[in-house]
Amino acid sequence: MGKIIFYEDRNFQGRSYECSSDCSDMSTYLSRCHSCRVESGCFVVYDVPNYMGNQFFMRRGEYADYMRMGMSDGIRSCRMVPQYRGPYRMRIYERENFGGQMYDLTDDCDSFVDRYRMSDCQSCHVMDGHWLMYEQPHYRGRIVYFRPGEYRSFRDMGYSNVKFSSVRRIMDLC
């Protein structure tokens, strides 16, 4: 079970809210959120309510100022990443609705272009495990968290101008 403490102001100041599960709208508990401390587990935090917008993966540690991380407006929602110790399986597709080239993944891939000659990934099906997909090769750029499920259109998820290029399994002891 994870535990994260959110603070209204930078450097762990102001009112706080302790969380150990998903939270779709932080404004229910805090008027703003500009720092946090992850005491256990791993979380994905979002800068828009309902798990939308830019995402940041957070493991155990202190995050005193979101501005330094590139988050412009603070945290608005969060998901706890559950512990997982089984096999990892994901199927990626070149086009929306599981169209075009398809590849099965069971491990990290630092470049879809280098490994598969696939220049874009527009949909995926996560069978097992929890994954982070990155906008750029070599695990750089914006991320999107994927848990088991079918993702027919990244555009419909709000990522119309994002071209995903690499993916990594979340294997931390979350």
Swiss-Prot record:
Residue ranges of coiled coil: none
Gene Ontology MF terms in the entry: structural constituent of eye lens
Annotated region described as Connecting peptide, given as residue ranges: 83-87
InterPro entries in the record: Beta/Gamma-Crystallin (IPR050252), Beta/gamma_crystallin (IPR001064), G_crystallin-like (IPR011024)
Keywords for the protein's UniProt record, in alphabetical order: Eye lens protein, Repeat
Residue spans crossing the bilayer: none
GO biological process: lens development in camera-type eye; visual perception
Domain of life: Eukaryota
Residue span, Beta/gamma crystallin 'Greek key' domain: 2-40, 41-82, 88-128, 129-171
One Pfam entry name: Crystall
Gene3D superfamilies: Crystallins (2.60.20.10)
Keyword Transmembrane helix belongs to the record: no
Function: Crystallins are the dominant structural components of the vertebrate eye lens.
Record-stated family: Belongs to the beta/gamma-crystallin family.
Domain notes: Has a two-domain beta-structure, folded into four very similar Greek key motifs.
Quaternary context: Monomer.
Name listed for the protein in its UniProt record: Gamma-crystallin M3
Organism: Cyprinus carpio (Common carp)
Biological classification of the source: Eukaryota, Metazoa, Chordata, Craniata, Vertebrata
